[in-house]
Amino acid sequence: MASFLRFRLSASLKPYITFGRMLYTRIDKDGLTMLAGHLAYVSLLSLVPLVTVIFALFAAFPMFADISIKLKAFIFTNFMPATGDIIQNYLEQFVANSNRMTVVGTCGLIVTALLLIYSVDSVLNIIWRSKVHRSLVFSFAVYWMVLTLGPILVGASMVISSYLLSLQWLANARVDSMIDETLRLFPLLISWVSFWLLYSVVPTVRVPAQDALIGALVAALFFELGKKGFTMYITLFPSYQLIYGVLAVIPILFLWVYWSWCIVLLGAEITVTLGEYRAQRHQAITEKSPSQSQEI
């Protein structure tokens, strides 16, 4: 009986073990940590230009003033844990200084911001082993759309949430508590949708929607857990402040950006491996069927 249970258990776990091995092999072959380090470096170079371009676009349209404020609070609270206030102060100073830049300097900012999106595009297509290249005009259009429409859609969704909370018929204890619990999941939902779009749109090959959704969900869950774990580490083990002093925000920001890219690329690797695992199983079944028919 015990041997039968062990056999059933090993048989039920075999697909997960096989998938785990395939995933580990792929991560090791692609050099996930090196790719994440590359993106972290480019992100730090592009962070100020990216934030400057985004909020300059909001400033150009007065109707987006409320969205800009809500989006700032959302980004620094949910995407830069524990050090959001300090980094926000520095970035706001940089953005204020950029207003005095010339046209050439402004174009340089935009190019640097687009460089990050180009790097993400290149790395994801390396993971997908894609050899298809988009035209320069199409790529620029996609990058510009991501740069402009992405923050606006996130900010608009937050404004809609605030509007729903202000409605009179929702001023009810039970409904209010339900909405409060739902809004707690809002950052997770935003991360999930963002990662799903990233894995679906950026690669130049067709990505099954189901695989992209699963990979994006895993990445979003790890991202939310990573935020809590990172905040806990900074709060409980503040020894980095004794070493770096006032410069402590620099290594903290770099570590968080690096960890975030590791999570994003892990979700991409899971998405790709799901498709490869399915293809491998289909091939095994196809090869097994003719041999069975010959025996008959």
Swiss-Prot record:
It is a multi-pass membrane protein. Its main location: membrane. It is found in: Cell inner membrane. InterPro entries: UPF0761_bac, Virul_fac_BrkB. The chain crosses the membrane at residues 44-64, 67-87, 108-128, 136-156, 185-205, 212-232, 246-266. GO terms for cellular component: plasma membrane. Keywords: Cell inner membrane, Cell membrane, Membrane, Transmembrane, Transmembrane helix. Belongs to the UPF0761 family. NCBIfam families: PRK01637.1, yihY_not_rbn. This is UPF0761 membrane protein YE0031.
